[in-house]
């Protein structure tokens, strides 16, 4: 269960208390591709305040503590951080610079270049395939800085509802054949059909297909849509209301089929139920 748009530091505990075991936050860049703040901006989901924010490096410092065992702020349930990279707001020519900057800030403020025990997995949410240079830069930077081992903690996810074969082609260009999630969804203000979601799930379940390990639906607020997604077999849902998802998961139909992921579950492995 991914808490959606958790952009203020005080919202982290709020969403965890509602039952989320993952959080998504938005990263806003300046025109040069430097990550500045966690901030969504207007418009955003219905019924939500769009303007909450924090300085990105301060947010990382806090979330490091929240995901470090034995830290006073530690919350065991938080196992995944989804960075919603607002690259569509900057020139595609700056995507590489943005990838370098985010990698260095994670190295300095989250992983602390090997001196941090923060353990959450990281999901890089890229809005459009045209911004794939962000991924190349991110991986290049980890390599150049001597921390390629952190690649094991990082997954890729394209969130713009683009053609799945087009996404596969870009992953092929990048040489990525594992640690890939696929999102499908729309703002909670609108309804969305299931055609592309079903296609993504079919690809995930195709033997030998290496470009989708997990599929999640976003942003779900109605229990009926949560149930629909679970019946289709999604691996996760993003919601403004994690507590509603918890209630649905306790229903007789789902209680034996689904459970919340823990740190002992590998987010890059396909679930074979």
Curated annotation (Swiss-Prot):
Cross-referenced Gene3D superfamilies: Phosphatidylinositol (PI) phosphodiesterase
Q: Which residues form the signal peptide?
A: none
Q: Does the keyword Lipid metabolism apply?
A: yes
GO terms for CC?
Answer: extracellular region
A GO BP term here is: killing of cells of another organism
| Cofactor binding note from Swiss-Prot or TrEMBL | Binds 1 Mg(2+) ion per subunit.
What residues make up the catalytic site? 4, 40 (nucleophile)
Location comes to: Secreted
- Supply the alphabetized keyword list: Cytolysis, Dermonecrotic toxin, Disulfide bond, Hemolysis, Lipid degradation, Lipid metabolism, Lyase, Magnesium, Metal-binding, Secreted, Toxin
Q: Which InterPro entries match?
A: PLC-like_Pdiesterase_TIM-brl
The EC number(s) this enzyme carries? 4.6.1.-
Question: Which residues are recorded as binding Mg(2+)?
Answer: 24, 26, 84
Q: Which reaction does it catalyse?
A: an N-(acyl)-sphingosylphosphocholine = an N-(acyl)-sphingosyl-1,3-cyclic phosphate + choline; an N-(acyl)-sphingosylphosphoethanolamine = an N-(acyl)-sphingosyl-1,3-cyclic phosphate + ethanolamine; a 1-acyl-sn-glycero-3-phosphocholine = a 1-acyl-sn-glycero-2,3-cyclic phosphate + choline; a 1-acyl-sn-glycero-3-phosphoethanolamine = a 1-acyl-sn-glycero-2,3-cyclic phosphate + ethanolamine
* Tissues in which the protein is found: Expressed by the venom gland.
* Cofactor(s) in the UniProt record: Mg(2+)
Which residue pairs form cystines in this protein?
A: 44-50, 46-189
* An example Gene Ontology molecular-function term: phosphoric diester hydrolase activity
What's its job? Dermonecrotic toxins cleave the phosphodiester linkage between the phosphate and headgroup of certain phospholipids (sphingolipid and lysolipid substrates), forming an alcohol (often choline) and a cyclic phosphate. This toxin acts on sphingomyelin (SM). It may also act on ceramide phosphoethanolamine (CPE), lysophosphatidylcholine (LPC) and lysophosphatidylethanolamine (LPE), but not on lysophosphatidylserine (LPS), and lysophosphatidylglycerol (LPG). It acts by transphosphatidylation, releasing exclusively cyclic phosphate products as second products.
Which protein family is it in? Belongs to the arthropod phospholipase D family. Class II subfamily.
Name the record gives this protein = Dermonecrotic toxin SdSicTox-betaIIB1aiii
Native source species: Sicarius cf. damarensis (strain GJB-2008) (Six-eyed sand spider)
Specify the taxonomic lineage: Eukaryota, Metazoa, Ecdysozoa, Arthropoda, Chelicerata
